[in-house]
Design a protein with these regions (language model features):
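Short, histidine-centered active-site or binding-site loop motifs used for metal coordination
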Residues: 5-9
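Helical "lid/coupling" subdomains associated with nucleotide-phosphate turnover
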Residues: 10-19, 26-38, 47-72, 81-245
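Active-site activation/catalytic loop segments of kinase-like enzymes and analogous catalytic loops
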Residues: 75
Length: 245
């Protein structure tokens, strides 16, 4: 088995090295011959620092063979990876910290991002309205009520441990502005959702534009759980359609 990992940063581990060692040991208990792909572009049979968060590089190395001048935008539940394939050789060895610093790791995703992580104020009835810095609602709520995902795609826990239906999502979105549906109605909650998506799309678009300008990439490919949404927003090729989920 060939393995990549991204769970070493979980707060149940004191350090990344501890997480890498635990994941490596646990996987090899089930698959004794497993090899682990690292950010150095090599396979390893023991825990080394390069194994931390190497999942993005495996996708990039695969796609680079198809189009070395492309840009891969991979949106997951929590983050969005922006990978300039033309610069692949310079990407080896990057950690999540350095990718954040370079703009290649954008910490916003299709499902788990809290609303105030992206948007600070929304317009309600034409009035600028600051949002509360609470975990009342997440990106999955916004994308569901906007029709970007269905209930079956809402695969993470809800902030209030309640339903994933449209009404439950609207209720959570209303709380973002310290209100409820009785106070701002469905229309107000939808304005919160739209403001979030507008801001999220802009953050990703700006990072993509910067990476394309720096790398000279000429084509965009999208992947991950948010691939269809991003291919429409960015005008890229949806790999989830072309290659399958």
């Amino acid at each position: 088995a060939a393995v990549v990992m991204s769970g070493e940063l979980a707060d149940c581990f004191s350090t990344k090295s501890e997480g890498v060692a635990w994941i490596t040991r646990t996987v090899r208990e089930v698959f004794p011959e497993a090899l682990f792909y690292g950010t150095d572009g090599r396979f390893h049979d023991s825990p080394v620092p390069a194994l931390a968060a190497a999942n993005w590089l495996a996708s990039a190395a695969f796609l680079h063979e198809r189009d070395p001048e492309g840009l891969l935008v991979d949106m997951g539940s929590t983050t969005t990876d922006i990978i300039p394939l033309a610069s692949l050789s310079s990407l080896y060895g990057l950690t999540d910290l350095t990718r954040l610093q370079k703009g290649y790791l954008v910490y916003t995703g299709l499902l788990r991002t809290t609303i105030p992580a992206i948007v600070r104020s929304v317009s309600l009835g034409g009035l600028p309205t600051p949002v509360s810095a609470e975990q009342f609602s997440i990106s999955a709520d916004a994308h569901l009520v906007l029709g970007h995902i269905g209930e079956e795609d809402y695969s993470c826990d809800t902030p209030d441990r309640k339903g994933r239906d449209r009404t439950s999502c609207l209720r959570r979105l209303a709380r973002v502005v310290c209100a409820d549906l009785d106070e701002i109605g469905t229309g107000g909650a939808l304005q919160v959702a739209q403001a979030f998506w507008d801001a999220q799309r802009e953050v990703i678009h700006d990072a993509v534009a910067r990476a394309m300008d720096e790398s000279g990439a000429s084509r965009i490919y999208t992947a991950g759980t948010g691939s269809m949404l991003l291919s429409s927003a960015l005008g890229g090729t949806d790999l989830s359609v072309e290659l399958g989920p």
